[in-house]
């Protein structure tokens, strides 16, 4: 069964690995979103609810753009957040940037009237973060593998993220974890409401990760989900 998918991302971030053969243009996060949109719209049964490349929003005010985005998020059931090296402007507050608001709205239960005049409340969206490689092809600005324990584990630099993303990772109520040899904590199972995956892994089997996001959503009561911006 197809799902309605919204994608949240930093449009013009160009610190990404090149994936096109057109050397006269610069690949950006939007280049990856185009690939994702193509899969959602043409290969899968899903419906793409995000912004389309070439869509002219220049004549609209910020309020009008935000209302359009809210309409699309409200009508979606999964929000994919694209993690890229330049996604966050550290000189601006999180609440002055688009992505945190899109995440917050995705997680809230929002009530609206339908065409019959009845109030309909949306559920918190399933969430999935896709990590893009930087221009050097590396993911280590956010994640890398550690081998300090008997079993290799994956390290996430959550301080790199917007606060609302950081709070919704490693936020399971009943924690299954152990102390690693270097003093860090290793988590087992689906410990985060916003799970994350590298682009190269996602694109090989996207449905596996989409299904996992919905599986986690079905157990949302097991997580401390943060929906507001500080």
Language-model features, listed with the residues they occupy:
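C-terminal interaction surface of TIR/SEFIR-family domains
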Residues: 4, 11-17, 133-230
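Short, flexible/disordered intra-domain loops and linkers
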Residues: 14-27, 89-99, 140-147
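Conserved N-terminal substructure of TIR/SEFIR domains
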Residues: 1-78, 198-230
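Short beta-alpha junction loops
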Residues: 85-86, 110-114, 118-138
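Short secondary-structure capping micro-motifs at structural edges
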Residues: 61-70, 103-118
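Conserved TIR/SEFIR loop-to-helix hotspot centered on a Trp-containing motif
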Residues: 86-112
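Short, compact, well-ordered microdomains
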Residues: 79-85
């Amino acid at each position: 069964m197809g799902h309605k998918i919204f994608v949240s991302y930093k449009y013009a971030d160009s610190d990404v690995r090149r994936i096109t053969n057109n050397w006269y243009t610069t690949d950006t996060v939007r280049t990856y979103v185009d690939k994702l949109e193509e899969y959602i719209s043409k290969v899968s049964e899903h419906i793409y609810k995000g912004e389309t490349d070439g869509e002219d929003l220049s004549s609209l005010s910020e309020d009008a753009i935000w209302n359009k985005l809210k309409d699309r998020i409200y009508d979606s059931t999964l929000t994919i957040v694209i993690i890229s090296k330049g996604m966050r402007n550290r000189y601006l507050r999180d609440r002055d940037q688009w992505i945190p608001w899109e995440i917050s709205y995705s997680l809230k239960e929002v009530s609206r009237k339908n065409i019959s005049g009845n109030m309909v409340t949306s559920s918190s969206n399933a969430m999935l973060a896709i990590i893009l490689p930087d221009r050097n092809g590396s993911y280590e600005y956010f994640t890398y593998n550690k081998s300090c324990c008997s079993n290799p584990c994956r390290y996430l630099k959550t301080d790199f993220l917007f606060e609302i993303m950081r709070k919704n990772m490693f936020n399971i109520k009943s924690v299954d974890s152990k102390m690693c040899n270097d003093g860090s904590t290793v988590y087992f199972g689906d410990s985060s409401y916003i799970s994350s995956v590298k682009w190269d892994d996602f694109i090989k089997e996207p449905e596996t990760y989409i299904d996992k996001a919905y599986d986690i959503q079905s157990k949302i009561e097991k997580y401390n989900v943060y929906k507001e911006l500080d």
